[in-house]
């Protein structure tokens, strides 16, 4: 690749991307345009602007994309009840395609030769950023400094920062922070003591949730309203997608909901350990499953359950803009036509449990399932023929096996 003259950098204002900004200027002698997305990470973003200006960025983009993030990425994913490897709610994975989309758009707007990101050569994010970028612009050039430079450790990064007078953030204990990714859906923490999966994570790692043991001693009940699979209200109050997730984070975090300590299988082949906090997403997933339980037909629900692991894997691996994800999304969205109603959750010391659900689109018939008189709603003698028909092949198999044994 010929040396670029202008690069659009996904910039957080943190240590890694600040070093990358300086490295791009030094290595390529190019202009650097920074893009910082407000995904609801809870940080003041003006310091990122000031830092980029101080370091000589030629242009600075800081954009509030919270509503787009939740409406066009998080909510479609939650319609699928997507969970990777049984635990991970894909908080980091789902943010990457939106960031890549804006990187490509800004590159085209500014006439940049390339885009750059701060993902390491060991992780999934390099794959996610680049697959999304190439899906949107097959001719885009991507610079991944972690795969090029010799700054192969945190120690070398810090040395580079000190030599180039780049400020180094400290955590509240005065130490270099964990590797943290945050957005409106979740916060993840990796590295340092967490790299040993046998060691219990210290409580100071958690940023968004209280320790469940310290959560309120009184349960809280909330009601989440849905229309066609998407949350539209909390306790009867209509809200925008980002506002709903923000409010659910606040409520769930207060009760210690959504903490995960997990080891996941990365797309690049290795396993990694992380501490994930997804308070609002945990409540949203529980409630969405609750409303689906009374509005989705059994066949549709079971098919969704079969498709979900593949859908989740596509998002995890970076294939959001792939045709197969789009095809699955169309099927999932079609299933949500009648997923409308309200779910009541009980929140208590780290647990979020569905305790009520109702809908004008409900398939639940109390008349059919009652243990009392059903006024002829269901003829129990019909079950005999149903059982005999379903047993026929099993009887034939058993008869053959007995015959062969004798």
UniProtKB/Swiss-Prot annotation:
UniProt cross-references to InterPro entries, sorted A to Z: Arginosuc_syn_C, Arginosuc_syn_N, Arginosuc_synth, Arginosuc_synth_CS, Arginosuc_synth_type_1_subfam, AS_cat/multimer_dom_body, Rossmann-like_a/b/a_fold
EC number: 6.3.4.5
Cited Pfam families: Arginosuc_syn_C, Arginosuc_synth
Highest taxon in the source lineage: Bacteria
Gene Ontology molecular-function annotations: argininosuccinate synthase activity; ATP binding
Disulfide bond listed as a keyword: no
Example GO BP: argininosuccinate metabolic process
Residues at which ATP binds: 10-18, 37, 118
Catalytic reactions on record: L-citrulline + L-aspartate + ATP = 2-(N(omega)-L-arginino)succinate + AMP + diphosphate + H(+)
Amino-acid positions noted as binding L-aspartate in the UniProt annotation, renumbered to this chain: 120, 124-125
Top-rank EC class of the record's enzyme: ligase
Major location category of this protein: cytoplasm
Keyword terms, alphabetized: Amino-acid biosynthesis, Arginine biosynthesis, ATP-binding, Cytoplasm, Ligase, Nucleotide-binding
GO CC annotations, alphabetized: cytoplasm
Localization annotation: Cytoplasm
Annotated binding of L-citrulline, by residue: 88, 93, 124, 128, 179, 188, 264, 276
SUPFAM superfamilies per UniProt: Adenine nucleotide alpha hydrolases-like (SSF52402), Argininosuccinate synthetase, C-terminal domain (SSF69864)
Pathway: Amino-acid biosynthesis; L-arginine biosynthesis; L-arginine from L-ornithine and carbamoyl phosphate: step 2/3
Quaternary structure annotation from Swiss-Prot or TrEMBL: Homotetramer.
Similarity remark: Belongs to the argininosuccinate synthase family. Type 1 subfamily.
Name used for this protein in its record: Argininosuccinate synthase
Organism annotation: Roseobacter denitrificans (strain ATCC 33942 / OCh 114) (Erythrobacter sp. (strain OCh 114))
Lineage: Bacteria, Pseudomonadati, Pseudomonadota, Alphaproteobacteria, Rhodobacterales
């Amino acid at each position: 690749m010929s040396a670029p003259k202008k690069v659009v950098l996904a910039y957080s204002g943190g240590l890694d991307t600040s070093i990358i900004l300086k490295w791009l200027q030094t290595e390529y002698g190019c202009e650097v345009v920074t893009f910082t997305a407000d995904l609801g990470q809870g940080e003041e973003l003006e310091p990122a602007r000031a830092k980029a200006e101080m370091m000589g960025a030629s242009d600075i983009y800081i954009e509030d994309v919270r509503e787009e993030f939740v409406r066009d990425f998080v909510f479609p994913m939650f319609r699928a009840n997507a969970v990777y490897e049984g635990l991970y709610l894909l908080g980091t994975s789902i943010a990457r395609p939106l960031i890549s989309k804006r990187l490509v758009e800004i590159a085209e707007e500014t006439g940049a030769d390339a885009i750059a990101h701060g993902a390491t050569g060991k992780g999934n994010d390099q794959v996610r950023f680049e697959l999304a970028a190439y899906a949107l612009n097959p001719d885009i050039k991507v610079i991944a400094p972690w795969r090029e430079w010799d700054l192969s450790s945190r120690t070398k990064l810090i040395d580079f920062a000190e030599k180039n007078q780049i400020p180094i953030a400290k955590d509240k204990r005065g130490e270099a922070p964990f590797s943290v990714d945050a957005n409106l859906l979740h916060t993840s923490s990796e590295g340092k003591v967490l790299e040993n999966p046998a060691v219990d994570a210290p409580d100071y790692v958690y940023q968004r949730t209280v320790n469940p043991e310290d959560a309120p001693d009184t349960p809280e009940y909330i009601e989440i309203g849905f229309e066609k699979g998407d949350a539209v209200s909390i306790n009867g109050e209509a809200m925008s997608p980002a506002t709903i997730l923000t409010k659910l984070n606040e409520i769930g975090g207060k009760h210690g909901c959504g903490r995960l300590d997990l080891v996941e299988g990365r797309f690049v082949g290795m396993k990694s350990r992380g501490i994930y906090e997804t308070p609002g997403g945990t409540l949203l997933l529980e409630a969405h499953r609750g409303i689906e339980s009374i509005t989705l037909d059994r066949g549709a629900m079971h098919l969704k359950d079969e498709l979900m692991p593949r859908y989740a894997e596509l998002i995890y691996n970076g294939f959001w803009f792939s045709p197969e994800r789009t095809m699955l999304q169309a099927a999932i969205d079609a299933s949500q036509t009648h997923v409308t109603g309200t779910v009541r959750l009980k929140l208590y010391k780290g647990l979020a449990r569905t305790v009520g659900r109702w809908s004008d689109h409900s398939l639940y018939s109390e008349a059919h399932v009652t243990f009392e008189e059903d006024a002829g709603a269901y003829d129990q003698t019909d079950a005999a023929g149903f059982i005999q028909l379903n047993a026929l092949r099993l009887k034939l198999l058993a008869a053959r096996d007995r015959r062969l044994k004798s």
